[in-house]
Amino acid sequence: MAKVKKQVSLVQRPIKKFAPVFILPTFLAFIIGFIWPFMQGIYLSFCNFNTPRDAKWVGFQNYLKVFSDAGFANAFKNTALFAIVSIILINVLAFTIAYALTQRMRGANLYRTVFFMPNLIGGVVLGYIWSMIFDGILKNYGTYLTANGTYGFWGLVILVAWQQIGYMMIIYIAGLQAVPEDMLEAAKIDGASGSQTLFQVIIPNVMPSITTCTFLTLTNSFKMFDQNMALTGGLPSVIVEGVAGKAKVNITELLALNIYSTYNINKNWHGVAQAKAVIFFILVAVLAIAQQWATRSKEVEQ
């Protein structure tokens, strides 16, 4: 036994010795590809620039412009509402479908494939497809998708739900199949009804899947860009009176599209767009951490 342990230690010793050599390339790539651009982005958020080389320090001016921008406030409100609606709708429907498909129904595998397929289509393609579908329906009523902010908002909700429900469904199916059979049998023997079994046995055991799906839908909702750009482009637009005077506000614009528009439309606001991106990162990080903490605290140990 001692001889075996000695041989193992002799094998592990050179591996530990050369571990930094194997880690170094990935670590350097991480620094060059993520850490350095991230730190540079934070610095540029305090500058006025057209290119990083001509950046001029302006302090907190960019952040003051962000908080006085009516378009950013509108995009934040839209994104918050969109995230709430999407999280509830996608997770409720995905869990319901997953629960139905784990009840030994015929053709379950076919249904899983069909529900998952929309997730394989790119967001821009989906945006243009659904734009044609919605406009084709609405023209019968003498209107179109971007004529009203309500149409655009709910059109985006439908598009994203249709795309993501299948993916979340797969995660919920994995969670439901991991529920211990002995717990279900014990609940049945104790005379628990279907709803009691669902809410007191199944859902507590599926909390890890709920945590994952809630995290994904939350972050996806806040990062939503390509579908928003392709479906409505943020339209329609209105002129509003803000803190900094009159400004054009895109009614269906979400945060990611607002940052993109700020950078590309107004060349003098590159630093402002960068400041928005930093605020956006902090916001998503805080919400994601808070959501993970809130849902993980409700998970049960297997």
Q: Whereabouts are the PLM-identified features?
A:
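A structural signal for multi-pass alpha-helical bundles of membrane permease subunits
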Residues: 14-302
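Short, Lys/Arg-rich, polar N-terminal cytosolic tail immediately upstream
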Residues: 1-13
